[in-house]
Amino acid sequence: MFLDTAKIKVKAGNGGDGMVAFRREKYVPNGGPWGGDGGRGGNVVFVVDEGLRTLMDFRYNRHFKADSGEKGMTKGMHGRGAEDLRVRVPQGTTVRDAETGKVLTDLIEHGQEFIVAHGGRGGRGNIRFATPKNPAPEISENGEPGQERELQLELKILADVGLVGFPSVGKSTLLSVITSAKPKIGAYHFTTIVPNLGMVRTQSGESFAVADLPGLIEGASQGVGLGTQFLRHIERTRVILHIIDMSASEGRDPYEDYLAINKELESYNLRLMERPQIIVANKMDMPESQENLEDFKKKLAENYDEFEELPAIFPISGLTKQGLATLLDATAELLDKTPEFLLYDESDMEEEAYYGFDEEEKAFEISRDDDATWVLSGEKLMKLFNMTNFDRDESVMKFARQLRGMGGDEALRARGAKDGDLVRIGKFEFEFVD
């Protein structure tokens, strides 16, 4: 089964908790704090593997969780950092944040790596909080929670040339005779239901990859037929071979076919029309094909401005192999002078997949539940909250000072909070003291 989209969840490892410990040894009076830091949580890393061809591995395994770091230890020893979880993906995988739709990365090179979820840093042990005023602190931090996100994966096959056209115009036959690929061929619509890939070698020794894509029909850009399921694969191609059945064996007008397919390409992604097209007039061994070709050329010229350059037209027969060598040489020549096309605008890409907080991000938000409990929320606040060790009084007091420094007490008071009101942060409830 060919699978080219998948939605998965990834969870990086939490940082290990810092430790509260004190040095207690004979002949070492006033040993002081000795608790070490927790280890870093493991990242979730995507690694490109050229041996993979589909996203099939993600059909049943949709959850990926990295290990957490070890806790800090006595003698000031740090906990061990967790190993990264490395997930193999095929070449041509685009990774999006499922919530925002932003493109995180486009993985196209073998061995390329990208961190899709960052592990949390280890919490600090009490040795880190020693000061002249507090030489024996009973303060430690919990490890930072690892990043958790839902991802949308899209596989767009890597090919230099894409074959497009209506069903049964001869795309699969053409691919089978110009490459060693063995696509499924039949005298019925949608014989090809997955993209097929083959390598072409011209008489002059040049080579390039060709993809035979499932046939398009009118409305494909809106999902009709196989629709957008396979239109995405055209995006990576640099040259489009537009295959047209000049025999009109299906009862359609070849020129109307040409217009209809271009309309679908344009509707799906305007940039597809920036790619150079070669018109391949196929089935020229059939009766009336030559007459239809002359009519096609006439209509094409009528709809082009006199200063516009007409697309190149190559009459061929996939069955008899007539005209194939000339077509392949011209395709190779066009590829040599055609650059790669950007798949995404910069606005579609995250500048950096970084797990952290924006300087201008609001520290917290205040709301009120139906039971009159004040609720404090916000990513920055929850990070501090989750890293607080509430088993230690000094850690609790430290969090209270941080919350006050962020303006929490003042903001609650401004919203009308009174002495004795309940305040909820996460699953914990506190009493507001004015």
From Swiss-Prot:
Record-annotated membrane-spanning stretches: none
Main enzyme class: hydrolase
GO annotation, cellular component aspect: cytoplasm
One GO molecular-function entry: GTP binding
Pfam families, per database record: DUF1967 (PF09269), GTP1_OBG (PF01018), MMR_HSR1 (PF01926)
Function: An essential GTPase which binds GTP, GDP and possibly (p)ppGpp with moderate affinity, with high nucleotide exchange rates and a fairly low GTP hydrolysis rate. Plays a role in control of the cell cycle, stress response, ribosome biogenesis and in those bacteria that undergo differentiation, in morphogenesis control.
Record EC number: 3.6.5.-
Lineage of producing organism: Bacteria, Bacillati, Bacillota, Bacilli, Lactobacillales
Keyword match Cytoplasm: yes
Compartment annotation: Cytoplasm
Keyword Hydrolase: yes
Domain OBG-type G: 159-336
Homology family: Belongs to the TRAFAC class OBG-HflX-like GTPase superfamily. OBG GTPase family.
Domain OCT, first and last residues per copy: 356-434
Keywords: Cytoplasm, GTP-binding, Hydrolase, Magnesium, Metal-binding, Nucleotide-binding
SUPFAM superfamilies linked to this entry: Obg GTP-binding protein C-terminal domain (SSF102741), Obg GTP-binding protein N-terminal domain (SSF82051), P-loop containing nucleoside triphosphate hydrolases (SSF52540)
The name this protein goes by in its record: GTPase Obg
Main location: cytoplasm
Binding site for GTP: 165-172, 190-194, 212-215, 282-285, 317-319
